[in-house]
A protein has these predicted regions:
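Extracytosolic ligand-binding ectodomains
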Residues: 1-176
């Protein structure tokens, strides 16, 4: 068989294990998969990576707020933030904004605030908001491509951003 690519839908350490074994077995078909977790990709190493992936956030984003977050985080910890660090930071930021604007920590008041369409700076080009019917955070995601080894600056520099999805002219509901 000569597939165009191999799609994997694994998370966490299962990604790392798969990527390393895929390399060990000498398989060369391009890879693609569900949401890329940055830390398992760093653990697998650039030699075990290939293909296109989905990402919620990547430290290579160039929005001013992402650049500032990455710079501050990297300065404090010595490596760039991964997508989990971004998620933790953004969740705390959203909650602080909601508490400040409602002047309350009451769950019902916070839910009402979120359901009325409040928008949040989530370190991306587009703001995020919560959908009323299921409280899903509506946000853009990214297609990332594993970098050519010759272009990699360090072990953290593994991907390049291809595009944001959905496009700026499209509703965030498109991918939710």
């Amino acid at each position: 068989a000569k597939p165009d690519f191999v799609y994997i839908c694994l998370a966490g350490v299962d990604q790392t294990t798969f990527l390393k074994q895929y390399k060990e077995f000498g398989l060369s078909f391009p890879l693609a998969g569900g949401v890329m977790d940055t830390i398992p990709f760093w653990a697998a190493g650039i030699d075990s990576l290939s293909g296109h992936w989905q990402s919620l956030w990547y430290h290579g984003l160039t929005t001013p707020q992402s650049v500032a977050f990455t710079k501050k985080f990297s300065g404090q910890f010595g490596y760039p933030p991964d997508n989990q660090a971004w998620g933790d930071y953004v969740a705390a930021k959203i909650l602080c904004q909601a508490i400040a604007e409602t002047k309350s920590t009451d769950s019902a008041k916070l839910i009402e605030y979120f359901e009325k369409g409040a928008s949040f700076d989530i370190l991306k080009a587009r703001k995020g908001s919560f959908r009323k019917r299921d409280h899903q955070l509506l946000q853009e995601m990214y297609v990332v491509k594993v970098k050519d080894k010759a272009k990699v600056k360090d072990k953290w520099d593994i991907c390049e951003l291809v595009e944001a999805v959905p496009k700026a002219s499209e509703s965030l509901e498109l991918i939710q």
